[in-house]
Amino acid sequence: MGKSSFLQDFKAFAMRGNVIDMAVGVIIGGAFGKIVSSIVADVIMPPIGLLVGGVNFTDLKLQLKPAEVVDGVEKAAVTLNYGNFLQATFDFIIIAFSIFLFIRLLAKLNRKKEEVPAPAAPPAPSKEEVLLTEIRDLLKEQAGKK
């Protein structure tokens, strides 16, 4: 097993259709996630924050230990930032719901494609058509022998 065999195997693996499709899906999914996160953070959450008393969810935190100054050096407060968790949870729910709707739409479109019947095969020739075809072929044969 030489180096070139390893590289050829890797190239064959990387160029398979499903690997490339998956890579494209991951890239598009990342971009889609950013769009949905922006919609959640910038469009959906502000009105929800207003409804619950003007709260910005990302700012919600529980202070475990206050900030303190020791020997002229300020030590930051120790906080449990559960607001970020709430924001990420809302992002996840909306992204999952969006993907669910998209997959459901694709499944519906595929079902419609399957329901469309294939065009009917042309009917078999009648006995008269078969006889006329045989007569025509015999006449062509006789004309060819002359």
From Swiss-Prot:
Which UniProt keywords are listed?
A: Cell inner membrane, Cell membrane, Ion channel, Ion transport, Membrane, Transmembrane, Transmembrane helix, Transport
GO CC annotations, alphabetized: plasma membrane
Q: Does the keyword Ribosomal protein apply?
A: no
- Output the PROSITE patterns linked to this UniProt entry: MSCL
Q: What is its main location?
A: membrane
Q: Name one GO molecular function term.
A: mechanosensitive monoatomic ion channel activity
Transmembrane region positions? 12-32, 83-103
- Kindly give the membrane topology term recorded for this protein: Multi-pass membrane protein
Functional note: Channel that opens in response to stretch forces in the membrane lipid bilayer. May participate in the regulation of osmotic pressure changes within the cell.
> What does the record note on quaternary structure?
Homopentamer.
**Name of the protein described by the UniProt record:** Large-conductance mechanosensitive channel
Question: Can you name the source organism?
Answer: Phocaeicola vulgatus (strain ATCC 8482 / DSM 1447 / JCM 5826 / CCUG 4940 / NBRC 14291 / NCTC 11154) (Bacteroides vulgatus)
Gene name, per UniProt, is mscL
